[in-house]
């Protein structure tokens, strides 16, 4: 169930009327695909969608959600408070740059899983909606600074998972390599079988993978319905999936 102000999932509701990034396919895919751990960090949490998905999938986890935007921060607080997972989630209004240098320096805690649906319109003109523009524009979170923070805050055996446009795959992999991170999972996502892959689900680690996990998946079948892979991945979340 969805409306202009919220999106209802099986076990939680996400209101997104106050923040720039609305509930969308990218966030749902990442939240359903990323590996978890005892401690999880959601960078740029927006409405709290991915935070709540990870909390549902990994019931023993402790999750930290951060966002630099005041309205997104407040929206996540409200969405988390309405959920059954509130006791395991902490939310902070801060940038990942500041979080990595100040908060972690004081607490000396690192994360087993870091997730991020990053801003990626690196060279494009900003959209008229300033909040959405800030959420989607890489000026607020350069890839180099993102990877520097991940390198600092992730455990030696942790994973950093993201979803990005295929156009940025090369520069993203290069930046990861500069910060000592190895690509261990790569899922190329096509809307339909005849189209090129527009999105990439990526997972990075500090250790080279024993076996590289690479796959190409299609979101819609020939009739325009969700593919079996997409349905299987999101079955625990979408109301129309059994």
Features from the language model and the residues they span:
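SAM-dependent Rossmann-like transferase core, predominantly class I methyltransferases
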Residues: 2-39, 45-56, 203
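A generic structural signal for alpha->beta connector loops
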Residues: 11, 60, 86-88, 157, ...
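General small-molecule cofactor/ligand-binding pocket signal
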Residues: 15, 90-92, 184-187
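Conserved Class I SAM-dependent methyltransferase catalytic core
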Residues: 19, 141-197
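Residue-level signal for inorganic ion chemistry
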Residues: 30, 117, 146, 204
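Conserved SAM/SAH cofactor-binding pocket of Class I
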Residues: 32-127
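Mobile active-site "lid"/loop adjacent to the S-adenosyl-L-methionine
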Residues: 118-145
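SAM/dcSAM-binding transferase cores
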Residues: 194-242
């Amino acid at each position: 169930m969805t409306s202009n102000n919220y999106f209802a999932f099986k076990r939680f509701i996400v209101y997104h009327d106050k923040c720039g990034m609305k509930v969308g396919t990218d966030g749902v895919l990442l939240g359903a695909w990323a590996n978890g751990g005892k401690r999880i960090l959601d960078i740029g949490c927006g409405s709290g969608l991915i935070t709540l998905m990870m909390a549902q999938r990994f019931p023993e986890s402790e999750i930290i959600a951060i966002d630099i935007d005041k309205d997104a921060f407040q929206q996540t607080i409200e969405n988390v408070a309405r959920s059954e997972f509130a006791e395991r989630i902490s939310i902070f209004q801060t940038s990942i740059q500041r979080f990595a240098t100040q908060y972690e320096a004081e607490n000396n805690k690192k994360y087993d899983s870091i997730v991020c649906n990053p801003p990626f319109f690196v060279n494009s003109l900003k959209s008229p909606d300033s909040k959405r523009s800030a959420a989607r524009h890489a000026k607020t979170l350069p890839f180099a600074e993102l990877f520097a923070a991940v390198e600092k805050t992730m455990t030696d055996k942790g994973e950093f998972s993201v979803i990005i446009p295929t156009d940025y795959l090369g520069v993203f992999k290069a930046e990861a390599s500069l910060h000592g991170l190895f690509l261990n999972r790569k899922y190329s996502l096509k809307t339909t079988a005849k189209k090129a892959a527009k999105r990439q689900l990526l997972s990075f680690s500090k250790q080279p993978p024993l076996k590289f996990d690479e796959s190409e998946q299609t979101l819609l079948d020939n009739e325009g319905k969700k593919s079996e892979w997409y349905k299987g991945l999101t079955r625990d979340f979408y109301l129309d999936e059994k």
